[in-house]
From Swiss-Prot:
Superkingdom per UniProt: Bacteria
UniProt name for this protein: NADH-quinone oxidoreductase subunit B
GO molecular function list: 4 iron, 4 sulfur cluster binding; iron ion binding; NADH dehydrogenase (ubiquinone) activity; NADH:ubiquinone reductase (non-electrogenic) activity; quinone binding
Keyword Lipid biosynthesis attributed: no
Family: Belongs to the complex I 20 kDa subunit family.
Length: 194
């Protein structure tokens, strides 16, 4: 895993050409950067960092989702929290209240009658908040796309950050979606493909 930061002025070389949000690749430049940071910690006893970068780093390890299980995708979402996949190890702990949550996982078919309740729960969540759309039904209506009573994608109600495809998607797919959301948060709400 690369270090993401702006190298201190004491570190010269190719690192000065690295943008502040780009990871510093492992090697002598990263080693020099880490030594400079350790020296600064020993000299001053504290480290100066950008607050928003520090908050984004902290948020990646403490995502508290509001689970909104509406259909068969909810069973796979439950599997992701069990011992085999264990989303808790990534700091993802489900919360019973939207006021305590910062992520909403919408798993399943959203009907027109459920849409106002979904929006109300989303509005009750504190900022910053993210949405994971799980499964074909939540992504675009799925099997029931042409039904008069089905919303053709949860993104018509709330803004979606991560789409997890599948019918139903596996627990591994949800874990991957959560990891992608953590990467997006860490990179300042923009997903950089690697």
């Amino acid at each position: 895993m690369g270090v993401i930061a702006t190298p201190p002025p004491s570190v010269q070389g190719p690192s000065s050409q690295v943008p502040s949000s780009a990871p510093i690749p492992p090697g002598p430049v990263q080693d020099a950067y880490l030594q400079a940071v350790q020296q600064e910690m020993q000299d001053k006893g504290y480290l100066v960092a950008r607050f928003d970068a520090l908050m984004d780093w902290a948020r990646t390890g403490s995502l508290w989702p509001m689970t909104f299980g509406l259909a068969c995708c909810a069973v796979e979402m439950i599997h992701a929290y069990m011992a085999r996949y264990d989303l808790d190890r990534f700091g993802v702990i489900p919360r019973p209240s939207p006021r305590q949550s910062d992520v909403m996982i919408v798993a399943g078919t959203v009907c027109n009658k459920m849409a106002p309740a979904l929006r109300k729960v989303y509005d009750q969540m504190a900022e910053p908040r993210w949405v994971i759309s799980m499964g074909s039904c939540a992504n675009g209506g799925g099997y029931y796309h042409y039904s008069y009573s089905v919303v053709r994608g949860v993104d018509r109600i709330v803004p979606v950050d991560i789409y997890v495809p599948g019918c139903p998607p596996t627990a591994e797919a949800l874990v991957y979606g959560v990891l992608q959301l953590q990467k997006k948060i860490k990179n300042g709400n923009r997903l950089i493909r690697t």
